[in-house]
Amino acid sequence: MCPHRLVLEHVTSRWGVLILIELLDRPHRFSELRRAVGRFGRGVSEKMLTQTLQTLERDGFVHRDAKPVIPPRVDYSLTALGREVAEQVRALALWTEARMGEVGEARERYDAAKRALGAATQDDPRA
């Protein structure tokens, strides 16, 4: 697989998108980020959040700041590169949200056409 496609997969993955958008507002601790991402539907597991954060950190999008205190404190924030990609992802998410009415209408037209085609096929004795 081409390296740029792999990075695109990381950025546009189910959790990658939500993490990047959430970190645009401010840095988050792990538990804060997990709760914030969970607001968008089914929650993310600790394992998946950890894996996604590590992947985004490796790609240079997320900075992990572990503070040597007790109890341990780790903050996650966007790098300059991460902020740039997160703004692009957020723009796509906002566009999608704004166009959902049109997408819904297109889906209804498509489904109606498929149903009509299916009914016509059932009525045709040659089928």
Q: Model-derived features: where do they sit?
A:
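Basic, amphipathic "hinge/linker" alpha-helix immediately C-terminal to the N-terminal HTH DNA-binding motif
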Residues: 68-91
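Canonical helix-turn-helix DNA-binding module
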Residues: 37-71
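N-terminal helix-turn-helix DNA-binding core of bacterial DNA-binding proteins
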Residues: 2-48
